[in-house]
């Protein structure tokens, strides 16, 4: 069952978030089961919303890759997140994601065909 992961990452600036995302090499090595990643800036934190194929896939990414990456960027607060079942995902214009310039999805050739 598809799920949504919600996470607030305190102590993380957008600059360090961008560095961490580059270091994770998600374009070249996407985590199994990942569908969509959205990040926003909040006061003193970055908020993340992700859609995953399963809760197990989301938890595996957090435990095997994300925790170490956050530690490498001096995030000391314990990571907290919640996972909820996905009820609906509506995306009427997938091509807009690459046009707004906030996406790494377009870097993956197999994703371009999904937006066509």
Predicted stretch roles:
Residues 1-47, 53-67, 74-116:
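Short S/T/G/P-rich N-terminal loop/turn motif that feeds into the first structured element of a domain
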């Amino acid at each position: 069952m598809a799920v949504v992961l919600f996470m607030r990452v305190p102590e993380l600036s957008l600059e360090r978030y961008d560095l961490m995302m580059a270091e994770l090499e998600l374009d070249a090595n996407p985590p199994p089961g990942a569908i969509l990643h959205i990040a926003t800036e909040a006061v003193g934190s970055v908020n993340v919303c992700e859609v995953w194929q399963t809760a197990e896939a989301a938890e595996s990414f957090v435990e095997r890759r994300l925790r170490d990456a956050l530690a490498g960027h001096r995030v000391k607060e314990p990571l907290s997140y919640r996972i909820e079942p996905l009820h609906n995902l509506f995306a009427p214009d997938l091509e807009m994601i690459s046009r707004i310039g906030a996406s790494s999805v377009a870097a993956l050739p197999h994703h371009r065909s999904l937006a066509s």
